Regions:
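Alpha-helical segment proximal to the catalytic Tyr-Lys
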Residues: 96, 140-144, 201
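Residue(s) in the substrate-gating loop at a strand-loop-helix junction
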Residues: 111
Length: 216
């Protein structure tokens, strides 16, 4: 298993150690997915250590709330650079190796805001909508090579990314969700695991949405 990180190396190292303690073979590869050269280095390092790639999970993400009229060009480019360009870079780096083996799975991470849009998150919503479009189109292109491409689009998940939300906002979001709770990282992980497992072999070009019914 290869872990990639950019902003929090200490936490990534701790996770790698935890997985190794459970018996896993884990490599850690720092790099910025928005920079193609760094993605190529990550892929090269992984393939040197493990030989081949079975599953690629594109889950690097960045979120920021801004009024549309306040978004600077730099902010816009950063948001799309991480959330959309990063997926493009990772898929392009991985696909030659998957195509040569005629096997592989790619799982991208979008958001329910990529499906319906979010006020004050136009850049984020646009990037995540782009991820869904990329996933569906790429699934058609590489399906004949035996490669599946699917997307997970979570709802409101109880993570550090949403840590700035007030208790009142969190309660309101939970109330707005038919299952009356926020999602957990485990909810998202189970969706990814399903698509990566043999149970997901006949799924491609699909958007799996663990959102508790927030959007239906």
């Amino acid at each position: 298993m290869g872990l990639h990180c950019h902003t929090d190396l200490a936490r990534a190292q701790a996770l790698a150690q935890e997985l190794r303690a459970l018996g896993g073979q884990v490599g850690l590869y720092p790099g910025d997915v928005a920079e193609r050269a760094q993605v190529d280095q990550v892929m090269e390092g992984f393939l040197q250590d493990f030989g081949h790639l079975d599953v690629l999970v594109c889950n690097a993400g960045l979120a920021r709330q801004e009024l549309f009229t306040d978004i600077s060009l730099d902010s816009w480019r950063q948001m799309l650079g991480v959330n959309l360009d990063g997926v493009f870079h990772c898929c392009q780096a991985a696909l030659p190796h998957m195509i040569s083996r005629k096997a592989g799975k790619i799982i991208t991470l979008s958001s329910m805001w990529g499906q319906v849009g979010a006020s004050c998150e136009v850049a984020y919503s646009a990037a995540k909508a782009g991820v869904i479009g990329l996933t569906r189109a790429l699934a058609k292109e590489v399906g004949p090579s035996g490669i599946t491409v699917n997307c997970v689009a979570p709802g409101v998940i109880d993570t550090a990314m949403n840590g700035a939300l007030s208790p009142e906002t969190r309660a309101a979001l939970a109330e707005e969700t038919p299952l009356e709770r926020l999602g957990t990282p485990e909810d998202v992980a189970q969706a990814i695991w399903f698509l990566a497992s043999p149970a997901g072999d006949f799924f491609t070009g699909q958007v799996l949405a663990p959102n508790g019914g927030f959007i239906i």
